[in-house]
Amino acid sequence: MEWTVWWDMRRHPGEAQWSRAVEKTQAEALDRAHRFLKLGFVVYQIRDTNGAVFMDEVQITQHFGNAS
């Protein structure tokens, strides 16, 4: 089972353009998303092990606040 972080270096419309990072746990996925935000990347969503959206872009931004 894996958690998926959908992200990109700059904003692209449509999921087909997004990059994907895979982690084994929720904590690792959140940590990866936080690191991407600190680098100035766009984090679109985090999906859980069932493929359901765990956090969308707005929720991720609210969760981490100003990541820099």
Which residues are covered by each model-predicted region?
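Surface-exposed loop/edge segments in extracytoplasmic proteins
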Residues: P13-R20, A52-D56
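Intrinsically disordered, low-complexity regions of eukaryotic proteins
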Residues: T4, R10, T25, N50, ...
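Short, mixed-charge low-complexity intrinsically disordered segments
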Residues: K38-S68
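A short, charged, amphipathic alpha-helix used as a generic interaction element across diverse proteins
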Residues: G14, E23-D48
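Short aromatic-glycine-(Arg/Gly/Cys) micro-motifs in beta-strand/loop hairpins
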Residues: M1-W18, R47
